């Protein structure tokens, strides 16, 4: 009976952390969808400009976000070890890094964005919209990354529901601002695709204001005195933040950027294939929100238990998270396989494109199943602060296996555009195997040390 109660308690803890994260990540994805779809209604040039800008911004956003979310396992360990007094210092240094990275990103944009867009040989109007869209988004870069720093605190303390509510509030605000600035409604100027960037920048400021108010006012966070204590740069603390955060950020950057590179290789196959690839990838990205949410939840839960030296409990959370995620992944895989034509019809009515999307979705099923193993284990290893393993795994899977293999299957074996989906599946399979072996080795090592 005690075992049943402990199991139920772990299950409740896991879902209470994971489900709000899932809703949060879906809300963030929905904002990107609003940017694209509403820009598309403004015109094809506007959609092209915001898409180019979004593709440049996404790897930067994901990579920098990863560096800052490196604070999560650090805070989780301190929480488990009952060293709450040190948590405020960790978050203040994360905010410092957020400001520093934001300044570098803005400076790099000022110096190199125009040159980069010129090398892409875009139409003049598309070039202008992409450039101004990025400039508008830059208005909110600093508050966005500072919000990520505060989210690391709030989520790790188990208050993922607060973050969820913030992003659910921001979602309709972002949609309304898009409507106003893209189409020139409610007295606002008609900016087309650039308006989507303005709306995004303003939304980032709104999110940040709410995060600051919550951390400053709510009793659950007052103890950490994030904005009350004066900031003193501690090189040792900064080094810890970077030693954990940079490998996470690089791993996430490599994962995000490989899809951009694959899109460039697929572009040679023509408009129909590009459209089909983007549709299949868009749906796959939506499915990825489930393993990503399990991954983030397991980083928190495993990190707290590892910090408290309760390694057996951390192992139980690991097994539970992987098993649940795999069960959901199998269910979704069956659902996708049996409904591929209907899923394709959500994106297009063109029968030729539908046929290609159906083909790509077949490979997406395997991608989803392998990710159901790899993503949660990435989160588990980060919970143990074993971040270099996930970095090496991502580098090997995507840049040593996936890209060269994709080129081989395309140029030598003549598999066509499917070559890159096949190589993504194989690369992710190797990643899942490596991460699984690493997790078993690490957990056995920690169990031996505890004896």
Predicted segments with their positions:
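Short alpha-helical transmembrane segments in multi-pass integral membrane proteins
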Residues: 1-21, 75-140, 188-246, 302-367, ...
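Transmembrane helical elements of multi-pass membrane transporters/channels
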Residues: 16-35, 136, 147, 170, ...
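Transmembrane alpha-helix boundary and packing residues in multipass membrane permease domains
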Residues: 21, 25, 36-37, 73, ...
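Helix-terminus/linker motif at the lipid-water interface of multi-pass membrane proteins
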Residues: 26, 30-48, 117-124, 180-191, ...
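Small-residue hotspots at the loop-to-helix junctions and early N-terminal turns
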Residues: 44-55, 134, 197, 271-286, ...
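Small-residue-rich hydrophobic transmembrane alpha-helices
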Residues: 47-107, 144-163, 263, 276-340, ...
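Short runs within selected transmembrane alpha-helices of multi-pass transporters and secretion channels
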Residues: 68, 137-155, 163-174, 196-212, ...
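Structural signal for membrane-spanning alpha-helices in multi-pass inner-membrane proteins
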Residues: 109, 152, 178, 182, ...
């Amino acid at each position: 009976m005690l075992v049943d109660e402990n199991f139920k308690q772990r299950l409740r803890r896991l879902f209470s952390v994971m489900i709000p994260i899932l809703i949060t990540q879906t809300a963030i994805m929905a904002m990107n969808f609003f940017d694209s779809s509403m820009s598309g209604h403004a015109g094809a040039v506007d959609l092209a400009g915001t898409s180019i800008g979004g593709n440049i911004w996404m790897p930067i956003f994901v990579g920098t976000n990863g560096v800052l979310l490196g604070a999560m396992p650090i805070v989780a360990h301190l929480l488990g070890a009952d060293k709450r007094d040190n948590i405020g210092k960790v978050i203040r240094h994360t905010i410092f890094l957020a400001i520093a990275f934001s300044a570098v990103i803005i400076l790099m944009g000022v110096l190199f964005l125009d040159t980069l867009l010129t090398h892409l040989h875009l139409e003049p109007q598309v070039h202008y919209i992409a450039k101004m869209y990025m400039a508008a988004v830059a208005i909110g870069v600093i508050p966005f990354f500072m919000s990520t720093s505060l989210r690391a605190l709030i989520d790790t303390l188990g208050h993922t529901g607060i973050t969820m509510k913030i992003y659910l509030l921001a979602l309709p605000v972002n949609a309304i601002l898009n409507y106003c600035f893209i189409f020139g409604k409610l007295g606002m100027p008609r900016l087309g695709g650039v308006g989507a960037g303005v709306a995004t920048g303003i939304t980032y400021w709104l999110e940040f204001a709410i995060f600051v108010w919550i951390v400053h006012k709510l009793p659950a966070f007052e103890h950490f005195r994030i904005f009350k204590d004066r900031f003193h740069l501690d090189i040792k603390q900064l080094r810890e933040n970077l030693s954990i955060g940079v490998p996470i950020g690089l791993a996430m950057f490599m994962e995000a950027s490989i899809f951009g590179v694959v899109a460039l290789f697929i572009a040679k196959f023509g408009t129909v294939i590009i459209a089909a690839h983007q549709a299949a990838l868009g749906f796959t990205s939506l499915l990825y929100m489930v393993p990503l949410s399990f991954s983030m939840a397991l980083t928190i839960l495993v990190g707290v238990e590892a910090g408290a030296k309760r390694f057996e409990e951390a192992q139980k959370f690991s097994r539970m998270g992987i098993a649940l995620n795999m069960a959901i992944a199998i269910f979704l895989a069956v659902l996708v396989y049996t409904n591929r034509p209907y899923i394709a019809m959500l994106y297009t009515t063109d029968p030729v494109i539908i046929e290609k999307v159906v083909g790509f979705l077949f490979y997406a099923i395997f991608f989803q199943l392998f990710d159901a193993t790899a993503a949660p284990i990435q989160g588990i290893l980060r919970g143990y602060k074993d971040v270099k393993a996930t970095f090496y795994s991502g580098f090997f899977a995507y840049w040593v296996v996936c890209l060269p293999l994709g080129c081989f299957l395309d140029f030598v074996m003549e598999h066509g555009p499917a070559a890159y989906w096949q190589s993504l599946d194989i690369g992710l399979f190797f990643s899942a195997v490596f991460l699984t072996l690493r997790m078993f080795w690490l957990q056995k090592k920690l169990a031996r040390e505890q004896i």
